[in-house]
From Swiss-Prot:
GO terms for cellular component: cytoplasm. Keywords: Cytoplasm, Hydrolase, RNA-binding, tRNA-binding. Monomer. Its main location: cytoplasm. It comes from the Bacteria. It is found in: Cytoplasm. Hydrolyzes ribosome-free peptidyl-tRNAs (with 1 or more amino acids incorporated), which drop off the ribosome during protein synthesis, or as a result of ribosome stalling. Its EC number is 3.1.1.29. CDD domains: PTH (cd00462). This is Peptidyl-tRNA hydrolase. TRNA binds at Y14, Y64, N66, N112. Belongs to the PTH family.
Length: 186
């Protein structure tokens, strides 16, 4: 069984914001794999299905970004999901829009959703797909930037990165994450 989590904030006002690119990737996977995200438990919205013979759970925590671990840990405990069968997708300011970076482990890098996940799991050793949103320009505050929407010029690159993140997740169902890293980080 695999758990794929996208980080974001709940509510219409946060839809399609930079901070919600993880949610957008989960929506793409749900559409691609015909999984309904209609169960609300564990402080999140989730759905399950079978993909290439593997049971997959998709989760969008509804706790707000900074408390994401409060949703992830109880679901992992309930379904007895090992940390190596878990991947999290989230926005990253240090990566250009449209680009991905896959990592096996690491610090939160200033991302509060990842910080909460590390805190609740008790480890930094979990797989991540970091989705580029770039840094704010012209002295814009980071909080305003991440809670802002992508520009019309960025949308094609955003859509491409969402598709590539979904492709990486799909390959991960049948291949080691390290192999997927080598493919998608090149």
């Amino acid at each position: 069984m695999k758990l794929i989590v996208g980080l974001g904030n709940p509510g219409r006002e946060y839809e399609l914001t930079r901070h919600n690119i993880g949610f957008m990737a989960i929506d793409e996977l749900a559409k691609r794999w015909n999984i309904s995200l209609n169960e609300q438990k564990f402080k999140g919205l989730f759905g399950a299905g079978f993909v290439n013979g593997e049971k997959v759970i998709l989760l969008k925590p509804l706790t707000y970004m900074n408390l994401s671990g409060e949703s992830i840990r109880p679901l992992m405990d309930y379904y007895k999901i090992d940390v190596e069968d878990f991947v999290v997708l989230y926005d990253d300011l240090d990566i250009p829009v449209g680009k991905l970076r896959l990592r096996m482990k690491g610090s939160a890098g200033g991302h509060n959703g990842v910080k909460s996940t590390i805190s609740h799991l008790g480890t930094q050793e979990f797989q991540r797909i970091r989705m580029g949103i770039d840094r704010p320009k012209n002295g814009m505050k980071v909080v305003d930037y991440v809670l802002g929407r992508f520009t019309s010029e960025e949308i094609p690159d955003v859509n491409h990165s969402i598709e590539k993140a979904a492709d990486a997740c799909e390959e991960w169902l049948n291949k080691p994450f390290l192999q997927i890293m080598n493919t998608f980080n090149s």
